[in-house]
UniProtKB/Swiss-Prot annotation:
Organism classification: Eukaryota, Metazoa, Chordata, Craniata, Vertebrata
Main location (coarse class): endoplasmic reticulum
Effect after changing residue 449 to K: In allele CYP5A1*7; does not affect KM value for PEG2; does not affect Vmax/KM value
Catalyses which reaction(s): prostaglandin H2 = thromboxane A2; prostaglandin H2 = (12S)-hydroxy-(5Z,8E,10E)-heptadecatrienoate + malonaldehyde; a hydroperoxyeicosatetraenoate = an oxoeicosatetraenoate + H2O; (15S)-hydroperoxy-(5Z,8Z,11Z,13E)-eicosatetraenoate = 15-oxo-(5Z,8Z,11Z,13E)-eicosatetraenoate + H2O
Name of the protein in its database record: Thromboxane-A synthase
Effect of residue 132 to F: Loss of thromboxane-A synthase activity. Decreased heme-binding
Effect on the protein of changing residue 450 to N: In allele CYP5A1*8; KM value about 1.5 higher for PEG2; Vmax/KM approximately 56 % of that of the wild-type
């Protein structure tokens, strides 16, 4: 009894604290590495993960460089961990086809972090399963050639402001960062086309829309918070969603209120009075269900296999009423995605194309001749003439997107356990398509670091191995806005090159340093000179 009493005394004393501390440390040690055996069990090679954070430090130089390193060290099928989340990285064309097309029903959804802005989460980019299918089907009509043709004048109006600004640099002869000019220009396009709110970023940098756009793209998660989110996602992600965040709430509130005000105004107007912009196209489609099936959603396939802008017969059907019309939040979400793609991706694509033309004057001269001939025939270009009348510009843009794909990685989630070409994929796994590594694989693209638009002649395209060129993804969940994005890039370069010639100068960084926190872009801008023609 005395012994038991002694034991009881000790158990109730400091040893309890010590025992609990040891148990907690042991639990933390186990937790810190418990998620890091899954890739090995799948037979996939990967960098050695660090406790809690996985391979976060592997990506400190940026996702673009690290993607290339992963492909080089571990092959076309490998993996990594960000915190406790496992990623399976694929740069093998046949397997990509299986994931994006053949087994699409099991890989319908994109990965979501749970931290997306409310407006982004309600966009077609992140909607899931049946609701994604309904909204995507409704929005398909907003990107028809007929609807896009109505947006050409709005893009051209914003381009006029860009040309006036560039003229000052041509007159001064000074080197300048043309990426900053494209940033202002794409802000104007997004405001006008997606939010129904014309702005002039050049003359009114303090405009509320301009300021909130800059705040949105400057928004980032502090590194210590990121480490906590990755290390303890089941606790930290729900906590981050409910905790007050003034910056996030102000941005959400501004864009939401802006769209709601425009919708209220449009609903009061007669149809002929309404501005014909992207927002109106979405509003027109909000009650209409598409008669198409998921198999008809692959708009990228249509764009790259079409002969001009002839309508697709499978899409010539009358829509039926939608069982659950698009909500205001979902309409705001589509405008928000236009903001992300229209600002960052279009800006970077224009910047890369300008850099490549400035540093490859022979290609630029060939393009200038095509532009001049086109302008003689089409002083006010329309969508169809842009689609069919500028083959070399198409080749230049295609090669730009091969070398510098802004969306150089995208994901799909496995809904159920499955096997893809002999590789076991567990339910919930995140599959990452390594577009950058694929586009720079010499097996598919000889001399991949060389700018060569001739890779994309009509004859050369026929020789490309399928699923080795994915700047807009592939399959039913490929980029819905591909036509609009290409239209904006083509129309901009057409107008700019009709007036100016790009010149490399001592300030031009060759080769460009790249930044890849999200989309791929120039790290230090694109400094060139321009000369009036």
């Amino acid at each position: 009894m005395e012994a038991l009493g002694f034991l009881k005394l000790e158990v109730n004393g400091p040893m309890v604290t010590v025992a609990l501390s040891v148990a907690l440390l042991a639990l933390l040690k186990w937790y810190s590495t418990s998620a890091f055996s899954r890739l090995e069990k799948l037979g996939l090679r990967h960098p050695k993960p660090s406790p809690f954070i996985g391979n976060l430090t592997f990506f400190r130089q940026g996702f673009w460089e690290s993607q290339m390193e992963l492909r080089k060290l571990y092959g076309p099928l490998c993996g990594y961990y960000l915190g406790r989340r496992m990623f399976i990285v694929i740069s093998e064309p046949d397997m990509i086809k299986q994931v994006l097309v053949e087994n699409f029903s099991n890989f319908t959804n994109r990965m979501a972090s749970g931290l997306e802005f409310k407006s982004v989460a309600d966009s077609v980019l992140f909607l899931r399963d049946k609701r994604w299918e309904e909204v995507r089907g409704a929005l398909m009509s907003a990107f028809s050639p007929e609807k896009l043709n109505e947006m050409v004048p709005l893009i051209s109006q914003a381009c006029d402001l860009l040309l006036a600004h560039l003229k000052r640099y041509a007159e001064s002869g000074d080197a300048f960062d043309i990426q900053r000019c494209y940033c202002n220009y794409t802000t104007d396009v997004v405001a006008s086309v997606a939010f129904g709110t014309p702005v002039d970023s050049w003359q009114a940098p303090e405009d509320p829309f301009v300021k909130h756009c800059k705040r949105f793209f400057e928004f980032c998660i502090p590194r210590p918070i990121l480490v906590l989110l990755l290390s303890f996602p089941s606790i930290m992600v729900p906590l981050a969603r409910i905790l007050p965040n003034k910056n996030r709430d102000e941005l959400n509130g501004f864009f939401n209120k802006l769209i709601r005000n425009v919708i209220a105004l449009r609903d009061q107007q007669a149809a002929e009075e309404r501005r014909r912009d992207f927002l109106q196209m979405v509003l027109d489609a909000r009650h209409s269900a598409s008669p198409m099936g998921v198999q008809d959603f692959d708009i990228v396939r249509d764009v790259f296999s079409s002969t001009g802008c002839k309508p697709n017969p499978s899409r010539q059907h009358q829509p039926s009423p939608m069982a659950r019309p698009l909500t205001v939040d979902e309409i705001v979400g589509q405008a928000f995605i236009f903001l992300i793609a229209g600002y960052e991706i279009i800006t970077n694509t224009l910047s890369f194309a300008t850099y490549l033309l400035a540093t490859n004057p022979d290609c630029q001269e060939k393009l200038l001749r095509e532009v001049d001939v086109f302008k003689e025939k089409h002083m006010a270009p329309e969508f169809c003439s842009l689609e069919e009348g500028l083959p070399y510009l198409d080749m230049v843009i295609a090669e730009t997107l091969r070398m510098y794909p802004p969306a150089f990685r995208f994901t799909r989630e496995a809904a159920q356990d499955c096997e893809v070409l002999g590789q076991r994929i567990p339910a919930g796994a995140v599959l990452e398509m390594a577009v950058g590594a694929l586009h720079h694989d010499p097996e598919h693209w000889p001399s991949p670091e060389t700018f060569n638009p001739e890779r994309f002649t009509a004859e050369a395209r026929q020789q490309h191995r399928p699923f080795t060129y994915l700047p807009f993804g592939a399959g039913p969940r490929s980029c819905l806005g591909v036509r609009l994005g290409l239209l904006e890039v083509k129309l901009t370069l057409l107008h700019v090159l009709h007036k100016f010639r790009f010149q490399a100068c001592p300030e031009t960084q060759v080769p460009l340093q790249l930044e890849s926190k999200s989309a791929l872009g120039p790290k230090n801008g694109v400094y060139i000179k321009i000369v009036s023609r």
